[in-house]
């Protein structure tokens, strides 16, 4: 039911709110907008109004209700206009809206065809949890990010407390609240819906350029999903996906500025003012070059300078546009010093920004703006390199035909929009960094594909077969690139995140909480537990045991942390893993799930904690002299010796494994051998079991498509769609094994059409764990110092002085 609410009801709610608010703008402006522009204008209203209402704490929680009320008001006052449109509809009227729906289905395809609650681009953009947490907090506390919760407050303060644009976030939080669904599952659909609005605008522009309804629908759909845009949408670029339809909308308003101004005069500026302010709210002051240049073009289109009277009208119109945009964009323009400082911080005048490429592995190429990139990632060279460049060449030819078509049709307004877009790109590119330049190329890409499709269809109008070939080549290039990205995107683990969310709800308010595993979405899912993560970028103060240090992106065993750093937490949430040690003796197990365990501190801290095992064998048999030394300390302190007994794990030596050529070796963050599966492949390794019994088999790493696991040629499991950050482990199955040698084989077969099927399968560990070898299965016992010899020869997780 939640899945249907996310992929069906949420889009209907989004489009309904946009429609209602768009009709309201029509009424206020006093004229009818082109039908395909009503929803994009209405979305602009959602952005600017939600930014105003989330500006102050008293009004922030009312934002969803206010947006709903405005939409209902628009439906009411615009009912007559809707009825009139329906009665005046012409044949094929439905093709325009089809562009928006088709775009949504294409961009949301990974979630839709996964058939479960998830989102795309997991592990690719490390700020996703920050965006969600910021959106959620905006709705309840407005722009007040002052909180004492260590990582939560510090992280949100570093982002949203410094003028970070939040137009998309306030809309996400508001419509998410109305839908009743968790924001984490709405993150991908929202961005697909935002692009669907761009598709409507492109379809209208294509129709304006003289194409048939069917051609315009195809142009609108495909121009809104070039490879680079699709890649950024899958990655979760909420700011850029929010601004894109507003930029295109401003371009469309240039084309109809004259008609609107003739009909209603100065009120015709209202749609543009809303689009411009929404663009500023979406990406901050960086949108100002688009707003200024597009605004000047729209003004010239509406008020051609033929005489002195026109100059006066032009000045009045310009003042109206500027003042209106600044006023409606006040939440962004108001704190100007913060906004400018943020913009400067991501420009090439900032040495830190210049040296930080974000998650890009290399600077993006200008050719990537042309919509074709036949590979699973925009960050590297395409898999099908030759085909990519052939298709890019065809796109370039079609762009030439597109400009010729627009010139012959005298589509001056559209040409001005296209030219202005290139000018803005060139201007901002001069001051950009690797990271921001990539975003600029992405925002330019739909313009290039739009012109190419106009050109291809223009040729088709005069030379049918040749034009059809050109259209087919562009469609294959763009949609084929999207298909490969769809196939390779990494989907979030539904069941594990659902379990984390349930922990966040069940134990809300029992913090502070330690989460030793590096999982960026802990910041959002465990936000009510006052969570802190030692491997996070803005973690609290942690001390580490000898031989360990704090590093971003690392997961840590509790034994890697100094005892005081553990004991300051009331609650511990940790992954079930054969590699993790049991918490100290004064913590007891509260809850165990499939993926996580929750522990609560119940007594005073031990006087000392002595960890024993390492890596995938967290237990060890300590020398008797070590136990005797602890016993001496216990006797002197008048205490006892506490211990956690744990059988020894059996890790497989992957360095000696036999592998297919399609498996590529490397090392993980801990320096262990790591193997990436580059296609159908096999990995086989052996080990000797010392004692017959039932063992749990664990894999360490990530798995996309089903990975068949065989022990002695007997299939025991085939995990799939399980991934995570450092330290991720997968509980495959339990098997009865005899004493002696055994073989373990991992088989990755060919793929299919499911999303994430060509994502990532990386294995850096195989472990056999005997019964009782899990942290949650250990029991803590104690002995008097005089009985220390009873511990000799036993496998222990740790020893404590209590």
Which ranges hold each PLM region?
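Membrane-interface helix-loop-helix junctions at transmembrane boundaries of multi-pass membrane enzymes
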Residues: 85-89, 93-94, 207-209, 214, ...
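Active-site lumenal/periplasmic loops and adjacent helix-entry segments of GT-C-fold
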Residues: 102-246, 383
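Transmembrane alpha-helical segments
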Residues: 105-106, 282-287, 331-335, 426, ...
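Hydrophobic/aromatic-rich transmembrane helices and adjacent perimembrane loops
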Residues: 129, 192-193, 240, 244-246, ...
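Signature aromatic-anchored transmembrane alpha helix within multi-pass, membrane-resident enzymes
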Residues: 267-276, 316-326, 450, 456-482, ...
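Hydrophobic, aromatic-rich transmembrane alpha-helices
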Residues: 298-306, 316-326, 369-411, 458, ...
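Short periplasmic/luminal acceptor-recognition loop of GT-C membrane glycosyltransferases, typified by
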Residues: 476-481, 486-497, 502-549, 565, ...
């Amino acid at each position: 039911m939640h899945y249907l609410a996310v992929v069906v009801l949420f889009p209907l709610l989004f489009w309904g709110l946009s429609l209602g608010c768009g009709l309201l703008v029509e009424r206020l402006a006093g004229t009818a907008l082109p039908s395909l522009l009503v929803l994009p204008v209405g979305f602009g209203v959602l952005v600017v109004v939600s930014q105003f209402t989330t500006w102050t704490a008293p009004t922030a929680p009312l934002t969803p209700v206010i947006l709903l009320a405005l939409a209902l008001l628009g439906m009411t006052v615009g009912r007559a206009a809707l009825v009139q449109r329906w009665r005046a509809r012409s044949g094929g009227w439905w093709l325009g809206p089809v562009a928006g729906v088709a775009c949504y289905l294409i961009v949301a395809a990974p979630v839709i065809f996964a058939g479960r609650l998830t989102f795309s681009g997991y592990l690719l953009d490390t700020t996703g949890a920050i965006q969600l947490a910021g959106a959620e907090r905006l709705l309840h506390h407005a722009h007040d990010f002052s909180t004492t919760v260590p990582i939560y407050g510090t992280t949100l303060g570093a982002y949203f407390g410094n003028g970070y644009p939040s137009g998309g976030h306030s809309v996400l939080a508001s419509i998410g609240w109305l839908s009743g669904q968790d924001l984490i599952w709405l993150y991908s659909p929202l961005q697909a819906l935002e692009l669907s609005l761009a598709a409507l605008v492109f379809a209208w522009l294509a129709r304006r350029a003289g194409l048939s309804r069917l051609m315009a629908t195809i142009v609108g759909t495909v121009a809104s999903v070039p490879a680079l845009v699709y890649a950024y949408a899958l990655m979760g670029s909420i700011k850029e996906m929010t601004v894109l339809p507003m930029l295109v909308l401003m371009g469309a308003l240039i084309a109809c500025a004259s008609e609107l101004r003739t009909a209603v005069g100065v009120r015709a500026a209202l749609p543009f003012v809303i689009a411009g302010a929404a663009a500023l709210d979406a990406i901050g002051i960086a949108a100002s070059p688009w707003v200024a240049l597009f605004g000047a073009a729209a003004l010239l289109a509406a008020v051609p300078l033929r005489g002195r009277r026109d100059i006066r009208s032009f000045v009045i119109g310009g003042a109206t546009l500027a003042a209106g945009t600044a006023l409606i964009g006040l939440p962004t323009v108001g704190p100007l010093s913060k906004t400018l400082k943020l913009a400067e911080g991501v420009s090439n005048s900032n040495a830190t920004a210049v040296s930080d490429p974000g998650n890009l592995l290399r600077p993006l190429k200008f050719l990537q703006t042309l919509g074709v990139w036949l590979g699973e990632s925009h960050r590297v060279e395409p898999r099908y390199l030759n085909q990519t460049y052939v298709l890019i060449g065809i796109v370039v030819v079609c762009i030439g035909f597109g400009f010729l078509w627009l010139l012959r049709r005298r589509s001056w307004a559209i040409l001005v929009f296209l030219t202005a877009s290139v000018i803005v790109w060139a201007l901002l590119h001069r001051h950009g960094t690797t990271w921001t330049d990539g975003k600029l190329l992405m925002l330019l890409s739909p313009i290039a594909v739009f012109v190419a499709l106009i050109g291809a269809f223009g040729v088709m109008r005069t030379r049918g077969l040749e034009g059809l070939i050109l259209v087919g080549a562009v469609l294959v290039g763009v949609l084929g690139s999207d298909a490969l990205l769809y196939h390779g995107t990494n989907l979030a683990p539904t069941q594990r995140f659902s379990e984390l969310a349930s922990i966040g709800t069940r134990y809300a308010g029992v913090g502070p909480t330690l989460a030793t595993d590096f999982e960026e979405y802990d910041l959002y899912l465990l936000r009510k537990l006052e969570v802190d993560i030692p491997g996070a970028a803005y973690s609290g103060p942690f001390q580490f045991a000898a031989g360990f240090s704090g590093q971003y992106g690392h997961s840590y065993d509790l034994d890697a942390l100094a005892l005081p750093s553990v004991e300051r937490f009331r609650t511990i949430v940790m992954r079930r893993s054969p590699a993790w040690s049991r918490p100290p003796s004064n913590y007891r197990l509260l809850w165990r799930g499939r993926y996580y365990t929750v522990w609560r501190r119940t007594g005073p801290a031990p006087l000392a904690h002595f960890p024993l095992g390492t890596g995938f064998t967290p237990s060890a048999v300590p020398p008797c002299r070590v136990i005797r030394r602890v016993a001496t300390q216990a006797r002197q302190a008048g205490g006892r010796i506490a211990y956690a007994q744990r059988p020894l794990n059996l890790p497989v030596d992957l360095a000696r494994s036999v592998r297919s050529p399609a498996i590529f070796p490397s090392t993980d963050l801990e320096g262990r051998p790591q193997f990436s599966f580059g296609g159908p492949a096999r990995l086989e390794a052996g080990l000797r079991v010392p004692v017959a019994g039932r063992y749990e088999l664990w894999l360490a790493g990530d798995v996309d498509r089903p990975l068949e696991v065989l022990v002695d040629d007997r299939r025991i499991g085939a995990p799939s769609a399980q991934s995570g950050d450092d330290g991720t482990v997968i509980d495959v199955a339990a098997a009865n094994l005899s004493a002696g040698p055994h073989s373990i084989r991992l088989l990755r077969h060919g793929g299919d059409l499911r999303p994430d099927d060509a994502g990532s399968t990386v294995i850096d560990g195989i472990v056999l764990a005997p019964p009782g070898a899990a942290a949650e299965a250990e029991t803590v016992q104690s002995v008097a110092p005089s009985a220390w010899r009873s511990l000799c020869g036993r496998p222990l997780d740790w020893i404590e002085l209590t």
